[in-house]
Amino acid sequence: MKEKLEAIKEKALNELKSAVDKKNIEEIRVKYLGKKGELTQILRGMGALSSEERPIIGKLANEVRSKLESLIVEASEKIKDAEKKTRLESEIIDISMPGKRQTIGHRHPTYLTLNKVENIFRDMGFVIEEGPEVEYDKYNFEMLNIPKNHPARGEQDTFYINDNVVLRTQTSPVQVRTMLNQKPPIKMISPGKVYRSDAADATHSPIFYQVEGLVVDKGITFADLKGTLETFAKKMFGENVKMKFRPHHFPFTEPSAESDVTCFACGGEGCRVCKGEGWIELWGCGMVHPNVLRNCGIDPEVYSGFAFGMGLDRIVMLNYGIDDIRQLYESDMRFLKQF
């Protein structure tokens, strides 16, 4: 029996030395130490031995078992280390190979224009205010003197989330929120995305950018409005630009006007950009309607103000010679890399 145990140990040791993977090691473990393994069978036959042999053979069998278990663990670790080394060697990065350049984005003409607009107004003392794009009907319409039966509330112009919530159709609600939260004097612009229920084509988009402004203080007049817009136009389009105002109607301003500037592409001579007219419509503007001031808790007998707004996308398209507004929202790198 003693010789048999020594033979099992030597045989298992030789097999472990030639094992090449975890599968081989597991097969060796089962062969010798499993439920039907050779060493296990000897241990189960201990009862047939004499009382003198049993402790001697039992001790030797346990020593062989412990030795085999230790050798199996040692062989498993060697196999594991070898596999790890092989894997790491296969994953080594050849630093001598040329790298692949990461694809990055590019400056967008809308944001290039918006940054310029914001910087001009900051220099003029305006602060930038922001507000939610999902807006209450109350702020988007009602407090801006747009009653329930106004055509602008129709589904053909407005995206309704429910009866009381819309996707804002203008950034004017930011002006309302500012007047509710701040006391005059107020001098702010509110740039941002707005939404209209328009079918997308070369000149229309259901989403576009607006920049609106508001000034409220004592003694504000239409002359202040004209001076502000003229100053902006000269800084934006050049000192030689000229402006003209045409009477118009907006429910939230009274009096109201639309403002045109001489075409910055042809200097007013007439070209493709201005469609031969020499002028480009830029602003909608006017003096803040007394009802709007009252709705925001501002006494129109004490304070007055003016408001203005322009479509930023239109300026971007005219400035860069873009003839399809959809290009501004497609994120095509071939297009964006031109700017």
Curated annotation (Swiss-Prot):
Signal peptide: none annotated. One of its GO terms (biological process) is phenylalanyl-tRNA aminoacylation. It catalyses: tRNA(Phe) + L-phenylalanine + ATP = L-phenylalanyl-tRNA(Phe) + AMP + diphosphate + H(+). The keyword ATP-binding applies. Mg(2+) binds at E254. The keyword Nucleotide-binding applies. Its EC number is 6.1.1.20. Belongs to the class-II aminoacyl-tRNA synthetase family. Phe-tRNA synthetase alpha subunit type 1 subfamily. Its main location: cytoplasm. It is found in: Cytoplasm. This is Phenylalanine--tRNA ligase alpha subunit. Transmembrane segments: none annotated. Keywords: Aminoacyl-tRNA synthetase, ATP-binding, Cytoplasm, Ligase, Magnesium, Metal-binding, Nucleotide-binding, Protein biosynthesis. It comes from Clostridium acetobutylicum (strain ATCC 824 / DSM 792 / JCM 1419 / IAM 19013 / LMG 5710 / NBRC 13948 / NRRL B-527 / VKM B-1787 / 2291 / W). It comes from the Bacteria. Its cofactor is Mg(2+). Tetramer of two alpha and two beta subunits. GO terms for cellular component: cytoplasm. GO terms for molecular function: ATP binding; catalytic activity, acting on a protein; magnesium ion binding; phenylalanine-tRNA ligase activity; transferase activity; tRNA binding. Pfam families: Phe_tRNA-synt_N (PF02912), tRNA-synt_2d (PF01409). Binds 2 magnesium ions per tetramer. InterPro entries: aa-tRNA-synth_II (IPR006195), aa-tRNA-synth_II/BPL/LPL (IPR045864), Phe-tRNA-synth_IIc_asu (IPR004529), Phe-tRNA_ligase_II_N (IPR004188), Phe_tRNA_ligase_alpha1_bac (IPR022911), Phenylalanyl-tRNA_Synthase (IPR002319), tRNA-bd_arm (IPR010978).
